[in-house]
């Protein structure tokens, strides 16, 4: 069997025939008084099919990698699973995964699979391919606690390598607009030449034919910040004929949030592509009132025919690096050039002044946080700096006896990285308002980690361990922002439809058997900012492509994950 899953807009003819034959076979056997055999039968569960409709009590049968019967199943399963008192739903889809490196270290995908995530979708601005020689060398140099050989050149090569190593979840990726830009322009703050842009478009087309899901951008950071709207339109003009989606970390989530949303809509309108906003938020208390206008703006665009969606992580803090506290101009040329400039006294004075001064020319998450006491340092490469892990920027500045701005610059230089950083910038009421919109799905914006080994060297955002369980526990059960059936839809059929995944995201005959069995009364996130390495609770069993990966709350060791190819893939 191929490790690649065909993801056409509708089930393939062969898939429909298999289901048709299974139904005929079931009817024949029942008429004859016999019982068909299945690989797995899940019995007496409360079935949430992903559609948002009210649940029904029933059974579900699996043969091979697919669901073949839903309702009352008379036949026996080689494995019989009693789901009495439990919810049974499609596997959850992580629309914004940074499991790129963590899956190379540990293919079990523990922090996500223990929440019921069965598909990791990567590619926010940066993707693991295609790689120029320069970018490949940079990736090697920037590796931190997780070390790995780079044996691939293309995005497809990377995804293939994951499956060859073994992964418990399915995997997919957008091609990163930042990756494409670095391959052809480097870190220069300029527009591409006509020849460079043509080469960039060709690279996008190749990635789409290899199975990319579209183009992902991350416009707050250098060098993506240097790309103007026409460049992004050109990349999407290359991806759109393949059914590609444009998905973006907006150019601004603060002072110019509304203008940034307009830019995304312009790209969608000019290319005819659907578009999604990564981790929609209004960053910084001064900008929180803008969210109501943004939501209304998106509703209006959708009513006018644009297919605009968004995803969120359900926490009041974001996580990125100290680069988000410094102006983009100082970062031109990449990390080495950035660190060198930060050692020039005149440059340091200018950067420090700009770090302290509000502006709408670039996005400062340090200023959006309101105070360095609301900025937490979460990950270092250098062992000498690891004792600062989990401390606030204000506390570290006090320990070092330097200003907040000087401390941030010194840490970037000494660590050899942008330094993992958590910023408290998001309004709780806005999270609830966003979740009430039927076009909002969920993404962790984090790696898929484990509470052991190399992962314990960092103090990650708890969203890595809790985003999906938090939606079902806090926002569904406790706060009643969503019904359970709607909460399930947001994490299953909605992202599947946005990604054009015809056979995932639903409990229906012919769908791949990505299935979660969980207790609605007990599911919850346990990870905190103080103690992030804690798995969610309440998920009992998880199946991926018909194989049981979690049994009674314990990982089975199985790694049946596949590459989920985009709609333009040529096999």
Model regions: which residues?
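Active-site neighborhoods of metal-dependent hydrolases
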Residues: 159-162, 167-194, 198-221, 232, ...
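Acidic, glycine-enriched loop/beta-strand segments at the rims
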Residues: 47-59, 418-426, 430-431, 479-489, ...
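C-terminal motif of bacterial Sec signal peptides marking the signal peptidase cleavage site
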Residues: 30-31
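Histidine-rich, glycine-flanked metal-binding segment
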Residues: 34-38, 47-91, 106, 525
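Alpha-helix-loop-beta-strand connector modules within alpha/beta enzyme cores
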Residues: 233-244, 248
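C-terminal cap of metal-dependent C-N hydrolases
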Residues: 45, 344, 433-439, 445, ...
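Bacterial N-terminal signal peptides that target proteins for export
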Residues: 3-23
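Divalent-metal coordination cores built from histidine and acidic residues
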Residues: 86-88, 92-93, 97, 103-214, ...
């Amino acid at each position: 069997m191929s490790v690649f899953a065909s993801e056409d807009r509708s089930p393939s003819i062969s898939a429909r025939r298999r289901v048709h034959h299974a139904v005929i076979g079931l009817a024949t056997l029942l008429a004859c008084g016999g019982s068909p055999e299945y690989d797995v039968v899940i019995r007496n569960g409360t079935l949430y099919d992903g559609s948002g409709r009210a649940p029904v009590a029933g059974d579900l049968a699996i043969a091979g990698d697919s669901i073949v019967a839903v309702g009352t199943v008379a036949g026996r399963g080689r494995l019989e699973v009693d789901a009495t008192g439990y919810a049974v739903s499609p596997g959850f889809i992580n629309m914004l995964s940074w499991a790129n490196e963590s899956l190379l270290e540990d293919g079990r995908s523990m922090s996500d699979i223990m929440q019921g995530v069965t598909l990791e979708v990567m590619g926010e601005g940066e993707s693991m391919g295609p790689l120029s020689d320069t970018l490949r060398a940079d990736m090697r140099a920037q590796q931190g606690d997780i070390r790995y050989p780079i044996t691939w050149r293309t995005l497809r090569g990377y995804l293939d390598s994951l499956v060859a190593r073994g992964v418990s979840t399915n995997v997919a990726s957008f091609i990163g607009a930042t990756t494409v830009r670095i391959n052809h322009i480097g870190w220069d703050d300029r527009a591409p030449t006509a020849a460079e842009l043509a080469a960039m478009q060709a690279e996008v087309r190749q990635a789409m034919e290899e199975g990319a899901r579209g183009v992902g951008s991350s416009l707050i950071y250098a060098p993506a910040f240097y790309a103007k709207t026409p460049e992004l339109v050109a990349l999407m003009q290359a991806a759109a004929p393949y059914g590609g989606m444009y998905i973006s970390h907006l150019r601004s989530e603060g002072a110019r949030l509304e203008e940034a949303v307009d830019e995304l809509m312009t790209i969608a309108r000019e290319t005819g592509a659907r578009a999604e906003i990564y981790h929609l938020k209004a960053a910084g208390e001064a900008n929180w009132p803008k969210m109501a206008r943004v939501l209304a703006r998106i509703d209006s665009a959708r009513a006018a025919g644009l297919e605009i969606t968004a995803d969120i992580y359900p926490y009041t803090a974001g996580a990125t690096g100290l680069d988000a506290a410094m102006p983009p101009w100082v970062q031109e040329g990449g990390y080495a050039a950035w660190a060198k400039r930060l050692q020039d006294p005149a440059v340091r004075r200018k950067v420090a002044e700009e770090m302290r001064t509000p502006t709408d020319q670039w996005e400062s998450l340090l200023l959006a946080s309101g105070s360095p006491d609301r900025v937490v340092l979460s990950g270092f490469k250098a062992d000498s700096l690891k004792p600062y892990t989990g401390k606030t920027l204000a506390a570290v500045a006090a320990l070092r006896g330097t200003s907040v701005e000087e401390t941030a610059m010194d840490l970037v230089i000494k660590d050899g990285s942008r330094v993992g950083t958590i910023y408290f910038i998001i309004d709780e009421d806005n999270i609830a308002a966003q979740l009430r919109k039927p076009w909002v799905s969920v993404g962790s914006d984090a790696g898929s980690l484990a509470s052991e080994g190399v992962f314990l060297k960092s103090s990650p955002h708890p969203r890595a361990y809790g985003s999906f369980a938090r939606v079902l526990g806090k926002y569904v059960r406790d706060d009643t922002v969503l019904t359970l059936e709607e909460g399930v839809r947001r994490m299953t059929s909605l992202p599947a439809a946005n990604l054009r995944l015809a056979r995932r995201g639903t409990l229906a005959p012919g769908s791949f058997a990505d299935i979660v069995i969980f207790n609605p009364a007990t599911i919850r996130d346990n990870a905190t900012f103080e103690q992030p390495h804690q798995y969610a609770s309440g998920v009992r069993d998880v199946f991926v492509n018909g194989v049981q990966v979690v049994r009674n709350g314990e990982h089975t060791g199985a790694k049946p994950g596949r590459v989920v190819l985009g709609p333009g893939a040529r096999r």
